[in-house]
Structures are given as structure tokens and as C-alpha cells.
Amino acid sequence: MSAERASAPVMDVEAIQRILPHRPPFLLVDRVVAVEPGVRLVAWKSVTMNEPFFVGHFPGKPVMPGVLILEALAQACALLAVKSMGPDEDVDEKITYLMSIDGAKFRRPVVPGDRLELHVEVVKRKGAIWRQKGTAIVDGQTVAEADFMAMLADREQE
């Protein structure tokens, strides 16, 4: 058993919600199990039959929409960018905006009962712009992958 599978979460859902603006049902990361700031992050999404998208996708044969797998990976990328900020930077004042997704590939369906492992790694960083590679895995098999570009920006004051 890998350390990522055996250890307690690095971030639980409450810690994740302090960083990401998403909320259920659109929060697609349940926990972070490994993080190396500036390098990589591994997160999980437990896919249950109670997911609202299964009502219409597809009745009688529920399959997680591929675009939501990509969204889960993008949320993991945002977590990695924020967790990679320096100690002098204020996490509460930052938000990550997705700029592009390239090379998306889907290998097999994700269904109720699957645990989606979200593996993201930094490819390149230039200032506030991040290029990351994301791979979604279920039971050791790649189910989706894509390249992401995002910008870490200041949140507007409300």
C-alpha cells in the first residue's frame, strides 16, 4: 500500500473549501492525500450514486460526464497552485482562473462507486501563469488526462 493510500489526508474538505470557491454539488475534490508544493498534488473524489449529474447522464447507465472529470482535475490544479504560494503570500486573497485545456483524452467511463484519483503536476510556471498536467485514475487505470493552463489572480474585494 502506498503512503498516499495509507496516510491521513493532507487537506480535508473543510481545508479545500477555504481555498476553492466551489461548493457542492460543484466541488469535485473531497481530500488531498499528497502535495509537494511547486511539483505535484494527489487528490481524491469519491463518486457516489447520489451525484446530481447521474439523474440525466445516463438514466439506467450512470456515467460521470467527461467534462466534470476535467473540472475535478482543474480544481486539483488550482489547489496545487495555491499550496505552492510562498509564506508571504495571502492565500485568502487569491483565486485561480482556468485559461485553457489541451489534449484531453478519455480512456474509460467513471461510474458510481469509483474513487477518482486526481494526479496533477507542474509543467511550467511563469509568474502567475501555471501549466500543469492532470491524470485521473480509477483502480490503477488512467480514465482521463489533459494539459491545463491557469492564472493565479487577486480576488476582487467585496
Curated annotation (Swiss-Prot):
GO terms for molecular function: (3R)-hydroxyacyl-[acyl-carrier-protein] dehydratase activity. GO terms for cellular component: cytoplasm; membrane. It catalyses: a (3R)-hydroxyacyl-[ACP] = a (2E)-enoyl-[ACP] + H2O. Its EC number is 4.2.1.59. InterPro entries: FabA_FabZ, FabZ, HotDog_dom_sf. It is an enzyme of class 4 (lyase). The active site is at H57. Keywords: Cytoplasm, Lipid A biosynthesis, Lipid biosynthesis, Lipid metabolism, Lyase. It holds the Pfam family FabA. Involved in unsaturated fatty acids biosynthesis. Catalyzes the dehydration of short chain beta-hydroxyacyl-ACPs and long chain saturated and unsaturated beta-hydroxyacyl-ACPs. NCBIfam families: fabZ, PRK00006.1. This is 3-hydroxyacyl-[acyl-carrier-protein] dehydratase FabZ. It comes from Anaeromyxobacter sp. (strain Fw109-5).
